[in-house]
């Protein structure tokens, strides 16, 4: 089964680095706690075209379960409904771990 990447975007002005760090560190404990619900990683986004996050989930099912329950909360907190883009990811390359995976299983890649 593939992992699922969800890109969440809010059409809001770019925040200062200080605001972005404060926002990320204040909500990071919530996302750390979602490991039990299938969240593998979250990256906070901040740029000229808006703010948001990139979420890597263990499955689309896990991602849909969480976002379905939380989309209204996110819209209320930011004052605008986010745009969500969904992707299946079959082959992640992780240079921090030095591995390539296919559907969750490490494979040996020969150059």
Language-model segments: residues:
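Short S/T/G/P-rich N-terminal loop/turn motif that feeds into the first structured element of a domain
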Residues: 1-50, 60-68, 83-111
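A short, exposed loop/beta-hairpin motif centered on an aromatic-Gly-Thr core
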Residues: 52-56
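A common structural junction motif
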Residues: 71-78
């Amino acid at each position: 089964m593939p992992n699922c990447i969800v890109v969440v975007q809010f059409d809001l002005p770019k925040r200062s680095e200080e605001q972005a760090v404060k926002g990320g560190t204040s909500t990071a404990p919530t996302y750390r706690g979602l490991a039990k619900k299938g969240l593998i990683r979250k990256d906070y986004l901040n740029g000229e075209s808006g703010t948001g996050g990139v979420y890597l989930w263990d499955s689309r099912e896990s991602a849909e379960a969480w976002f379905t329950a939380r989309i209204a909360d996110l819209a209320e907190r930011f004052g605008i409904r986010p745009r969500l883009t969904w992707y299946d990811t079959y082959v992640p390359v992780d240079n921090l771990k030095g591995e390539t995976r296919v559907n969750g299983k490490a494979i040996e890649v020969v150059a």
